[in-house]
């Protein structure tokens, strides 16, 4: 588990397999700093077309797992046991939402989106296969909306919906996050059916050479902690 496909852009068909640790290290260490700052600058100047052009050429991951030959649903070959909750248009509440999200035990990771106006959450889940995904996504989206008091973008209900890279030096990762299943209301999930599940990939680490610029990926089971940022924000 915890392995995902990284595409150089949304129309690429040849992904690289990385871990969530790798992805969050890239978000933190500035791997996508230049395009992220360019995108945000264009948005601030109301240059929407230029901003979208930058975003369209941005690398993205498939939080649900590993894909082959594209990222359509039928390209998914193994599960990461995580899902993405996309909270958009947070504006002045962005930092507050990020801080509170980092305190949730089932949050595997959190970071400020490429626009700087939203928060991406990766949530740990426990499912047997792709047929279980719609129910747990719907229940988790409702839970997060209730706990954080915000609406979320329903696009992530599609299991292979891509998540763009970003630059956030305070990005949070907790490899020991608990499965959200235990935090959902009774009856939120329907009984599971028996079928041949999509397998979960072995938990190994693939370290891109780009990590040599100052922030190595966390080892499996460790946290990339947002505590310093949280403390400075609350004081």
Feature-to-residue mapping (PLM):
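Short, glycine/charge-rich beta-strand/loop segments that flank catalytic centers
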Residues: 63-67, 116, 159-160
């Amino acid at each position: 588990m915890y392995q995902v496909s990284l595409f150089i852009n949304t129309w690429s068909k040849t992904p690289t397999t990385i871990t969530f640790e790798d992805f969050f290290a890239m978000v933190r260490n500035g791997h996508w700093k230049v395009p992220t700052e360019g995108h945000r600058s264009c948005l601030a100047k109301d240059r929407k077309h230029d901003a979208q052009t930058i975003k369209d050429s941005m690398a993205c991951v498939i939080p649900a797992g590993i894909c082959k030959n594209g990222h359509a649903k039928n390209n998914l070959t193994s599960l990461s046991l995580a899902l993405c909750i996309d909270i958009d248009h947070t504006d002045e509440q962005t930092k507050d939402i990020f801080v509170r999200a980092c305190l949730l035990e089932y949050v595997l990771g959190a970071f400020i989106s490429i626009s700087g106006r939203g928060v991406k959450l990766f949530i740990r889940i426990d499912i047997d296969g792709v047929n279980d995904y719609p129910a747990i996504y719907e229940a988790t989206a409702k839970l997060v909306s209730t706990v954080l008091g915000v609406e979320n973008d329903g696009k992530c209900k599609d299991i292979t919906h891509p998540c763009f890279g970003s630059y956030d030096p305070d990005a949070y990762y907790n490899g020991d996050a608990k499965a959200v299943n235990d935090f959902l209301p009774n009856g939120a999930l329907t009984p599971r059916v028996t079928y041949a599940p999509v397998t979960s990939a072995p938990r190994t680490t693939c370290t891109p050479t780009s990590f040599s610029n100052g922030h190595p990926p966390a080892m499996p089971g460790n946290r990339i902690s947002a505590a310093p940022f949280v403390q400075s924000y609350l004081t």
